[in-house]
C-alpha cells in the first residue's frame, strides 16, 4: 500500500525495522498507511512518537489484549487495593483472568458490578489498552459501533490503530510529538512515567529511521522459518538463487535444508542469526 498521505517518505522497510521481531510488520504497515493519516499522525515526529509509545505498551504491536493471568502473589503485589489491603483472599483468583478483571474493574469507568461481567468484557484492548465501558462507548461513537462491538474491533490491526489514534487525538498528544517531548507524551498516556527510559530509546531509534538518516539493512539477524516474510527471507532466497518473493514457503524451506546439510548444519529449515551470518559471510 502506498504511503502517499504522509508528509515524509514512509516505507514498509521502516516499519519492519521498527517492529523487529513482529512477523506481521508488513500487515501493520498497510494498516498504518490507511489509518494514521486520517488522524493527522502524518509527520516523522508524530509517527515516531506514536510507534514508540504504542510499541512500548503492546510489546512491539504483538499484544492486543490485556494480560490478567496473575498468580495469587502477583495479585497482592500489583493490585493490593483489591486484594491484600481489602482483606480479599487472592488464592481463588490465582490464574483466573476473567475473575480478576471482574474484581479490579467493577463499578468504575461506567462498568457494572462484578456479576455484570463488564470488567472482563471491557478489559484492556488494542495497542494502547482501551479499558472500561465508558472508553469503549466513547470510541464506539467515533466509529459508529456499540461498546460491545468496539471490544472486538480494537483487537484487529485496524481497530487497534483506530482506537489508539482516537485516544491520541482526544488527549492532544500530537502537540507533544511536535515538540519531541517523550516525557510529556508518556505522562499523558500513562498517568506517570512508567517505562520512560524504554519509550525514549524506542523514540530515538524511530526518529533515526523515519527522518531519512537510515539505510535499510539487507538482512535482519533474527530467526526466520516457514511462514516468515520480509527482506531477510528475500535475501536468503536470492542467495540460494531461487524465486525471491520474500515469502518463506515450502519450496524455500526445502532449499534451506539442502543448504544447511551442505554446510554441516542441522537441516531443520530454520535460519537463525548464526546461520544467516554464515550464509552472508559475516562473523
Kindly give the residue locations of the regions a language model identified.
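Acidic helix/loop microenvironments that form the catalytic cleft of cell-wall polysaccharide enzymes
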Residues: 54-57, 132, 177-196, 250-263
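Surface-exposed patches in mature extracellular/periplasmic domains of secreted proteins
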Residues: 40-50, 63-67, 174-186
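Extracytoplasmic/secreted envelope proteins and their assembly/folding machinery
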Residues: 12, 29, 33, 47-50, ...
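Acidic, Ser/Thr/Pro/Gly-enriched interdomain connector segments
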Residues: 9-19, 211-247
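Secretory-pathway/luminal and periplasmic proteins that interact with or process carbohydrate-rich
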Residues: 26, 56-66, 174, 191-199, ...
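Long, repeat-rich segments with strong aromatic
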Residues: 148-209
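Peptidoglycan-targeting cell-wall enzymes and recognition modules
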Residues: 3-27, 55-166
